[in-house]
Design a protein with these regions (language model features):
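Short Gly/Pro-enriched turn/cap motifs at secondary-structure boundaries
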Residues: 176-180, 208-210, 253-257
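N-terminal Rossmann-like NAD(P) cofactor-binding subdomain of oxidoreductases
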Residues: 1-172, 177-179, 196-198, 266-270, ...
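C-terminal active-site/capping subdomain that shapes the small-molecule cofactor and substrate pocket
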Residues: 221-314
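C-terminal substrate-binding/catalytic lobe of Rossmann-fold NAD(P)-dependent dehydrogenases
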Residues: 181-247
Length: 314
């Protein structure tokens, strides 16, 4: 539902090639009747599907909601939820786990996701920042104040054009937006508080608009006496069973993660400070790829099915 946006396009690309999936319909009110490849031009030659005006929720096993934030609540007010339907919502409406939804960050809640019918997919920045901090929270090592900055590509703003996504403005440019009050902070803090009992700290998060199309590069730093070796061991052990979260042996760059479902984490410690970097593709691990990962877990498929993607090296 909501098939014309960037996340829906990436979701379609992944599901077309998924070994266990047959797409029932791709709904779009604004593009009903048009070929999907006329909107998502990268799918030319890969699918003959057309956008549907109507749909039958009883005819599918899993529904992905790719509408704008706030529209999911309205959707369920207008459509009864079939008893057997599994739902993965990419909007932020139910990330607080209201209405029976489970928060869908596999590295945090894999077991709960496996038994869930309703999953709320995390936000893109929320994914990168949580993966940067979850091991510290699990070890009870989060300080009262955490400094974070992250640079995101223009696709994070969605498919609808705006003044800050216009090429002439975005190219060769950087700008801060929503400093200290980004909407993803709520879901990040909720997860951290659940892991580190009694933590009620502050995250000073400064998001930055980058002059590239896709990807997030997040930098989190705290004051701690932990050595780099100990920090690397902590993160490696925490993510030992996470197939897409990788602790890199050296420095991390964005191209290691873009076009994949990976979260690539870098660890640097010096003189009482720890820096954790995290690179993800905002449209994949930050959205559609993670949604497919959640579907795989919910359905009992191989968690990596349809997601074995290689980054572009150059």
């Amino acid at each position: 539902i909501g098939g014309a946006g960037y996340t829906a396009g990436e979701l379609t690309r992944l599901l077309i090639n998924h070994p266990e999936v047959e797409i029932g319909f791709i709904h779009s009110t604004s593009h009903a009747g048009q070929p999907v490849s006329a909107v998502h031009e990268g799918l030319l030659g890969d699918t003959d599907l057309c956008f549907a005006a109507d749909f039958d929720l009883n005819a599918v096993d899993v529904l992905f909601l790719c509408q704008g934030h706030g529209k999911s609540t309205q959707f369920w007010a207008e459509h009864p939820l079939p008893d057997t339907l599994r739902v993965i919502d990419l909007a932020q409406d139910f990330r607080d786990e209201s209405a029976g939804y489970v928060y869908g960050l596999p590295e945090l809640q894999r077991q709960r996701i496996s038994g869930a019918r309703l999953v709320a997919n995390p936000g893109c920045f929320a994914t990168a920042l949580q993966l940067s901090m979850l091991p510290l929270a699990a070890a009870g090592m989060l300080p009262d104040r955490i400094s974070v900055s992250g640079v995101t590509g223009s696709t994070g703003a969605g498919v609808k054009p705006g003044s800050t996504t216009h090429f002439s403005w975005r190219s060769d440019n950087l700008s801060v937006y929503k400093p200290f009050n980004h909407q993803h902070l709520a879901e990040i803090c909720r997860s951290l508080k659940g892991l580190q009992n009694g933590w009620d700290g502050v995250i000073d998060f400064v998001p930055v608009r980058g002059n590239f199309a896709r990807g997030i590069y997040a930098m989190t730093w705290i004051h701690t006496d932990m050595t780099e070796e100990a920090a690397r061991r902590l993160y490696t052990d925490f993510y030992a069973t996470a197939p897409f979260t990788i602790v890199a042996p050296g420095e991390v760059d964005l191209k290691q993660a873009v076009n994949t479902n990976k979260a690539v984490i870098g660890i640097t410690a010096t003189e009482g400070r720890l820096l954790v970097t995290c690179a993800i593709d905002n449209l994949l691990k930050g959205a559609s790829g993670q949604a497919v990962q959640n579907m795989n877990i919910m359905a009992g498929f191989d968690e990596t099915a349809g997601l074995r993607l290689k980054p572009s090296a150059f």
